[in-house]
């Protein structure tokens, strides 16, 4: 099919949502996601077959090709014929590296089904679990592709019987995860060899088999085994091609937008399902109001900013005006397009159910809701499962480039919401914070290469969190004019409360009674639960006062004081986390003039600071879980390397002559680990990390770490005292 014909076919199919599949591919790093995507494209005639596998069509960012890992989720559309009917498959490739978890979460919002790729030799790995968990949470249905099956025969020399046992083990592990995460969906979503929701093969050598494909082609395990033993892989790829087997599985088992939106809208949108727009989204109605969720901003050198997202209802055309709900802005669409490989094809209009690329939505960011309905409830904000934990300072080598650097940093933050940018106007120093060392390296490289900017960066540093481990006495904060007084108590916030907010079980928009009940269950007293006013970055503010005059009209200023205190705590001006701040009493001046922002905010902030310093203050540091697979004789070298970094070994699993070590260590000690482990194992270690939350810094290191941070920030090199903030 020539290119023009393909475009016509895609244009025709985009109007038939019954024949559309919006899917993602997720996996652990290096399990073969991008190679699989390429071969699916080759099969659908989008790239030449000889090149697939080497070409890494989706890794079209130069850096991705050099590093050999997928950094951004790329979009492609292709046409596949199944049982005499053409289908339009929109495919999003997602990164498997933990440092890029944000992209995966966003891609899950745009798709209805995923192909989970698992390496037959390594089995289900930690990152497989993480990405599958994200998919299940967003109500996205999985199918399974077990990759690199040829290695079982060539490298591990397994018999056909052992091979099947190995593959059944992988399926059982994936099913265990589905059952644990979605017991309600398990019966219809479980992976089953017999019905063809699992396929096996080699993405690199372009072949695959499944039970339904065996019925069509006569190629089953026995034939696969013989072909590989005899080195006839090319023949195998001709008789049972990968794309045919996998795309058939996608069409048979993954839902169309029509089926999926009936179930998914309620999970990702909290508005009224019976409203006009609610019904239009549930029915994927092209005639309804426009409801578009942006999942990614792509910056193309010629076209500029392109907003890519999923259209849930309505039809979009150039010239239309859309509200960007979260930005309270209105933008006019310039062009609308679909993807074919990395190429954007502009069309006249696109209806609901498709993945779209729009130019002109200049205020949109990843996660925005764009619509023709004023005051539409936005889609639930996309939850990222890891928060930025590593920071580096960055400056332009040539001071003349400073304005350009600021503009580039803003652009990067818009493309990738997991990247946090802090511009310090006083020192002229800019900080970028990300999910790990690699995440930041990639961004800095992008600045140098794509924007031709010479920049200098500091070595990476870890972001600590300040917290408390005890309860403070009541602390009085006075406003500068002495007319207002605030009485504050600070204590630890129960872990269960933090978890509930993080998972979205509780939020400040929900019904008050329901929230009160849930917070009490999680360990708050009934006064605290009823008085919960604001949850901010892992901290809770509770108003437990009774009948205080003027408090309502002053509350927003009090909360601003709370937020300021939580953004940068008293110990080392690091963000706070896990703190419950209670307002137990206050005295306010009757005249609003005497209780303005300049009076209330500093009074509340300094009272909170003094209270924190009297509540057994502590630092939390981010930890990483480390998974390393090495030959057994190198186990000693690896455990020494981990233990030398304040790490602890959690468990060890042996399989054949390889051993997998699972450990955890503070991120602070993990810089340079990649090089060290490569050296210690002469490059034979396969390793990956994932975030393991925050833990208390050991008491014997507390002082040293605080001074380190204070020195770096140019603060006084002494431990702060409560009297620095309030007159005791």
Swiss-Prot record:
Protein's cellular compartments: Cytoplasm
Binding site for GTP: 27-34, 93-97, 147-150
Residue intervals of the tr-type G domain: 18-258
Pfam families: EFG_C (PF00679), EFG_III (PF14492), EFG_IV (PF03764), GTP_EFTU (PF00009), GTP_EFTU_D2 (PF03144)
Example GO molecular function: GTPase activity
Gene Ontology CC: cytosol; ribonucleoprotein complex
Keywords: Cytoplasm, Elongation factor, GTP-binding, Nucleotide-binding, Protein biosynthesis
The organism's place on the tree of life at top rank: Archaea
SUPFAM superfamilies: EF-G C-terminal domain-like, P-loop containing nucleoside triphosphate hydrolases, Ribosomal protein S5 domain 2-like, Translation proteins
InterPro entries tied to this protein: EFG_II, EFG_III/V, EFG_V-like, EFTu-like_2, G_TR_CS, P-loop_NTPase, Ribosomal_Su5_D2-typ_SF, Ribsml_uS5_D2-typ_fold_subgr
Disulfide bond residue pairs: none
Modified residues (Diphthamide): 594
Function: Catalyzes the GTP-dependent ribosomal translocation step during translation elongation. During this step, the ribosome changes from the pre-translocational (PRE) to the post-translocational (POST) state as the newly formed A-site-bound peptidyl-tRNA and P-site-bound deacylated tRNA move to the P and E sites, respectively. Catalyzes the coordinated movement of the two tRNA molecules, the mRNA and conformational changes in the ribosome.
PANTHER family: ELONGATION FACTOR-LIKE GTPASE 1, TRANSLATION ELONGATION FACTOR-RELATED
Family to which the UniProt record says this protein belongs: Belongs to the TRAFAC class translation factor GTPase superfamily. Classic translation factor GTPase family. EF-G/EF-2 subfamily.
UniProt protein name: Elongation factor 2
Originating species: Archaeoglobus fulgidus (strain ATCC 49558 / DSM 4304 / JCM 9628 / NBRC 100126 / VC-16)
Protein encoded by which gene: fusA
């Amino acid at each position: 099919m020539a290119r023009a014909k393909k475009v016509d076919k895609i244009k025709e199919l985009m109007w038939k949502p019954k024949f559309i599949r919006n899917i993602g591919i997720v996996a652990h790093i290096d399990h073969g996601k991008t190679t699989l995507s390429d071969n699916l494209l080759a099969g659908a005639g989008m790239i030449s077959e000889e090149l697939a596998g080497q070409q890494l069509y989706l890794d079209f960012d130069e850096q991705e090709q050099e590093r050999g890992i997928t950094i951004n989720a790329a979009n492609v559309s292709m046409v596949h014929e199944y049982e005499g009917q053409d289908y339009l498959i929109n495919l999003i490739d997602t990164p498997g590296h933990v440092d890029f978890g944000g992209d995966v979460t966003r891609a899950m919002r745009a798709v209805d089904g995923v192909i989970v790729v698992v390496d037959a030799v390594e089995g289900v790995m930690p990152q497989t679990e993480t990405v599958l968990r994200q998919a299940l949470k967003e109500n996205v249905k999985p199918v399974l592709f077990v990759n690199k099956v040829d290695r079982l025969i060539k490298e591990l020399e397994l018999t056909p019987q052992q091979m099947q046992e190995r593959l059944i083990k992988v399926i059982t592990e994936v099913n265990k995860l589905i059952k644990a995460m979605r017991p309600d969906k398990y019966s219809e979503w479980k992976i089953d060899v017999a019905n063809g929701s699992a396929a096996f093969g080699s993405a690199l050598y372009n072949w695959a088999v499944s039970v339904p494909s065996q019925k069509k082609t006569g190629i089953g395990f026995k034939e696969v085994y013989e072909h590989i033993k005899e080195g006839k892989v090319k023949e195998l790829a001709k008789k049972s091609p990968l794309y045919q087997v996998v795309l058939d599985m996608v069409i048979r088992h993954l839902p169309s937008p029509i089926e999926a939106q009936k179930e998914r809208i309620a999970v990702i949108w909290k508005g009224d399902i019976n409203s006009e727009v609610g019904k239009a989204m549930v029915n994927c109605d092209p005639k309804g109001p426009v409801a578009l969720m942006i999942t990614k901003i792509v910056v193309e050198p010629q076209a500029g900013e392109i907003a890519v997202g999923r259209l849930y209802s309505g039809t979009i055309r150039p010239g239309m005006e859309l509200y960007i709900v979260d930005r309270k802005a209105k933008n006019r669409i310039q062009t609308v397009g679909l993807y074919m490989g990395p190429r954007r094809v502009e069309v006249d209009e696109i209806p609901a159910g498709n993945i779209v690329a729009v130019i002109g939505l200049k205020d949109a960011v990843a996660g925005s809701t764009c619509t023709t309905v004023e005051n539409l409830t936005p889609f639930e904000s996309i939850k990222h499962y890891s928060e930025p934990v590593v920071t580096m300072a960055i400056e332009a080598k040539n001071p003349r480039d400073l304005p350009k650097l600021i503009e580039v940093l803003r652009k990067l933050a818009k493309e990738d919401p997991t990247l946090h940018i802090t511009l310090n106007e006083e020192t002229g120093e800019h900080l970028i914070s990300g999910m790990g060392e690699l995440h930041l390296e990639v961004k800095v490289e992008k600045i140098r290469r794509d924007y031709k900017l010479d920049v200098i960066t500091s070595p990476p540093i870890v972001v600590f969190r300040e917290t408390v481990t005890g309860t403070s006495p009541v602390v009085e904060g006075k406003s500068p004019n002495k007319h207002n007084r605030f009485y504050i108590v600070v204590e630890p916030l129960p872990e269960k409360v933090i978890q509930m907010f993080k998972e979205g079980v509780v939020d400040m928009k929900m019904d008050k009674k329901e929230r009160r009940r849930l917070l009490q269950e999680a360990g708050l007293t009934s006064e605290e639960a009823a008085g919960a006013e604001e949850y901010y970055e892992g901290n809770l503010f509770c108003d437990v006062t009774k009948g205080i005059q003027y408090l309502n009209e002053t509350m927003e200023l009090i909360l601003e004081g709370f937020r300021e205190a939580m953004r940068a705590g008293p110990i080392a001006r690091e963000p706070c986390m896990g703190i419950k701040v209670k307002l137990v009493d206050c005295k306010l001046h009757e005249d609003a003039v005497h209780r303005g922002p300049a009076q209330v905010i500093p009074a509340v902030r300094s009272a909170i600071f003094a209270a924190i310093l009297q509540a057994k203050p502590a630092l939390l540091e981010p930890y990483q879980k480390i998974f390393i697979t090495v030959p057994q004789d190198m186990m000693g070298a690896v455990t020494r390397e981990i233990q030398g970094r304040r790490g602890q070994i959690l468990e060890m699993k042996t399989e054949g002559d390889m051993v997998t070590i699972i450990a955890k260590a503070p991120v602070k000690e993990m810089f340079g680990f990649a090089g060290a482990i490569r050296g210690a194992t002469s490059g034979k270690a396969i390793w990956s990390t994932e975030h393991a939350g925050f833990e208390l810094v050991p008491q014997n290191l507390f002082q040293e770490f605080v001074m380190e941070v204070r020195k770096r920030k140019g603060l006084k090199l002494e431990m702060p005292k409560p009297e620095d903030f309030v007159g005791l």
